[in-house]
Amino acid sequence: MEEVNLIVMIEVMPGKRGTQLDAYKRLKPLVESEPGCLKYELFCDAADENKFVLIEKWASQAALDAHDISEHMLAADALNPTFRAGPARVIKMASVKA
Protein backbone atom coordinates (compact mmCIF):
# COMPACT_ATOMS: atom_id res chain seq x y z
CA MET A 1 0.00 0.00 0.00
CA GLU A 2 1.20 3.47 -0.83
CA GLU A 3 0.98 6.30 1.67
CA VAL A 4 -1.30 9.24 0.85
CA ASN A 5 -0.02 12.78 1.44
CA LEU A 6 -2.33 15.79 1.44
CA ILE A 7 -1.75 19.51 1.56
CA VAL A 8 -4.99 21.25 2.53
CA MET A 9 -5.08 25.01 2.00
CA ILE A 10 -7.63 26.78 4.19
CA GLU A 11 -8.72 30.41 4.36
CA VAL A 12 -11.03 31.66 7.10
CA MET A 13 -13.27 34.71 7.19
CA PRO A 14 -11.81 37.80 8.88
CA GLY A 15 -12.19 37.48 12.63
CA LYS A 16 -12.65 33.68 12.52
CA ARG A 17 -9.04 32.59 13.09
CA GLY A 18 -9.84 31.49 16.65
CA THR A 19 -12.70 29.33 15.42
CA GLN A 20 -10.35 27.50 13.03
CA LEU A 21 -7.78 26.99 15.78
CA ASP A 22 -10.41 25.69 18.21
CA ALA A 23 -11.73 23.26 15.59
CA TYR A 24 -8.23 21.95 14.93
CA LYS A 25 -7.46 21.52 18.65
CA ARG A 26 -10.69 19.56 19.08
CA LEU A 27 -10.15 17.39 15.99
CA LYS A 28 -6.42 16.70 16.27
CA PRO A 29 -6.56 13.98 18.99
CA LEU A 30 -9.56 12.34 17.33
CA VAL A 31 -7.92 12.26 13.91
CA GLU A 32 -4.55 11.12 15.22
CA SER A 33 -6.23 8.18 16.96
CA GLU A 34 -7.71 6.96 13.67
CA PRO A 35 -6.13 3.84 12.15
CA GLY A 36 -3.66 4.82 9.45
CA CYS A 37 -3.18 8.47 10.44
CA LEU A 38 0.54 9.21 10.24
CA LYS A 39 0.42 13.01 10.40
CA TYR A 40 -2.18 15.73 10.97
CA GLU A 41 -0.55 19.12 11.51
CA LEU A 42 -1.81 22.66 11.00
CA PHE A 43 0.41 25.59 10.03
CA CYS A 44 -0.54 29.26 9.77
CA ASP A 45 0.64 31.71 7.13
CA ALA A 46 3.22 34.05 8.68
CA ALA A 47 1.96 36.96 6.55
CA ASP A 48 -1.82 36.39 6.69
CA GLU A 49 -3.46 35.17 9.89
CA ASN A 50 -6.54 34.02 7.96
CA LYS A 51 -4.65 31.43 5.89
CA PHE A 52 -3.66 27.95 7.05
CA VAL A 53 -2.09 24.83 5.60
CA LEU A 54 -2.98 21.41 6.98
CA ILE A 55 -0.51 18.61 6.26
CA GLU A 56 -1.95 15.10 6.38
CA LYS A 57 -0.28 11.74 5.83
CA TRP A 58 -2.23 8.49 5.72
CA ALA A 59 -0.99 4.90 5.55
CA SER A 60 -3.36 4.15 2.67
CA GLN A 61 -6.21 5.49 0.58
CA ALA A 62 -8.55 3.22 2.55
CA ALA A 63 -7.48 4.90 5.81
CA LEU A 64 -8.11 8.33 4.29
CA ASP A 65 -11.49 7.23 2.95
CA ALA A 66 -12.51 6.01 6.43
CA HIS A 67 -11.32 9.31 7.92
CA ASP A 68 -13.40 11.32 5.45
CA ILE A 69 -16.62 9.61 6.58
CA SER A 70 -15.84 9.50 10.30
CA GLU A 71 -18.47 11.00 12.58
CA HIS A 72 -16.20 13.80 13.80
CA MET A 73 -15.13 14.80 10.28
CA LEU A 74 -18.71 14.85 8.97
CA ALA A 75 -19.68 17.08 11.91
CA ALA A 76 -16.68 19.36 11.27
CA ASP A 77 -17.46 19.57 7.56
CA ALA A 78 -20.98 20.75 8.38
CA LEU A 79 -19.58 23.63 10.48
CA ASN A 80 -16.77 24.71 8.13
CA PRO A 81 -18.97 27.06 6.03
CA THR A 82 -19.71 29.11 9.16
CA PHE A 83 -16.09 30.31 9.46
CA ARG A 84 -14.22 29.44 6.27
CA ALA A 85 -13.94 31.90 3.38
CA GLY A 86 -14.61 29.08 0.91
CA PRO A 87 -13.91 25.41 0.34
CA ALA A 88 -10.47 24.14 1.26
CA ARG A 89 -8.12 23.39 -1.61
CA VAL A 90 -6.85 19.82 -1.29
CA ILE A 91 -3.68 18.80 -3.11
CA LYS A 92 -2.82 15.09 -3.16
CA MET A 93 0.95 14.67 -3.28
CA ALA A 94 3.10 11.70 -4.24
CA SER A 95 6.41 11.05 -2.51
CA VAL A 96 9.51 11.47 -4.64
CA LYS A 97 11.89 8.57 -4.25
CA ALA A 98 15.57 9.47 -4.55
Language-model segments: residues:
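Short, well-ordered beta-strand segments in beta-rich or mixed alpha/beta enzyme
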Residues: 4-11, 41-68
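An amphipathic, aromatic/His-enriched active-site/gating alpha helix that lines ligand/cofactor pockets
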Residues: 26-39, 57-91
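Short flexible/disordered coil segments
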Residues: 8, 70-71, 96-98
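Short, surface-exposed ligand-recognition loops at beta-strand->loop->(often short) alpha-helix junctions
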Residues: 11-20
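Short, flexible segments with low predicted structural confidence
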Residues: 2-4, 19, 35-37
